[in-house]
Amino acid sequence: MRHALKLLLLSLVLAATVDGLAWAGFDEALKAYQAKDFSTALSEARRAAGAGDPRSSLLLGAMYQAGQGVEADQTQAVSHYETAAKGGVIGAFSKLAQAYSRGAGVARDREKALAYARRAAQLGDLEGTFFLSVILTAEYLGYLDPGGKPDDKKYWQLAGRPLSERGIDTEARDALYWSADKGYPLAMMTMALNMGGSIGDGNRKRMQALIDKMPNNSYPALQNYGRISKHMDTLGDSFTSPQLFFDAQAQQMVAAMLQTCGLRDRKEMDKLPMPKLIATKITKPVSNAVYLPSKVAGYDRAYLIAGDWEEGWTYTGCDKTATVTIKFTADGLGGARIVSEQTMKGR
């Protein structure tokens, strides 16, 4: 009995010693990695991984993936990520999702990529949750043709789905909302761009708040959205997104020129001064509104699927003022289109 007890105690001591060495090895590996001493990081991570620390397997996977201290080997990277995932390291699931999505080191498998991304999201991993949004949007909700151009047929097929068939839409957007709210940089930028191009209550404010949190933002499209949004704020009320506001300008400008300057022929446009937009007003709020459901607090009205509204845009030109009445209808995928000829009231 005493002999058995001694063996048990010895095994516990040895296990604790091995665990301690593994933890120490990982700490040394991480410290060396952060100092860009990849040779030391590699040897320490290998030692710790061999002692059973799954965190070191994650680090090894990252080093093999990037070719840091060792020749890049995507197959080895995936192998280490799998070991880390089996050991319960949260960050490994996102890496595996990305590997299977790209077909890097493994055969491309969309379903496995999605399963790993969902597992990462369930565990609260920011990178994995954001990637869940990416893979759902690109693989299941995308409407680009093989050449990267919009496929109108695919777009309208997606836009015409009933709410009962939009579970993936909600999952994708909620993953984006959550990871952006938690401060994941790529999610913040992606959501800011998304808010700049989609119709929803408070989307411009959300976009601007995200831009303000990214002072070093150098993405041209996002900078343009920011400028357009601030200009819209000076004009009054509008339910349009910065993208829709920009897209509608040319058509409304012609309508305004007809009334303010008496434009009779498009050929005269070059000879006449361009009217200036001086005010916007929502004349009829959104009716028959349908929003994409969300499980993330505060986003239940962030993505308009169906609904109609009307706005009056006031222009000045040729010493006259005219208000152009515009009717919008949601297009089913967060955008909207003009559905009727404009009417103009001049004074």
Feature-to-residue mapping (PLM):
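TPR/TPR-like (Sel1-like) alpha-helical repeat modules
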Residues: 174-181, 203-220
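Alpha-helical segment of the N-proximal tetratricopeptide repeat
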Residues: 25-51
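Cysteine-centric segments in proteins
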Residues: 164, 218-347
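Short helix-capping/linker turns of helical repeat alpha-solenoids
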Residues: 50-53, 66-68, 87-89, 102-104, ...
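Hydrophobic face of amphipathic alpha-helices that form TPR/SEL1-like repeat modules
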Residues: 25-32, 59-66, 95-102, 131-139, ...
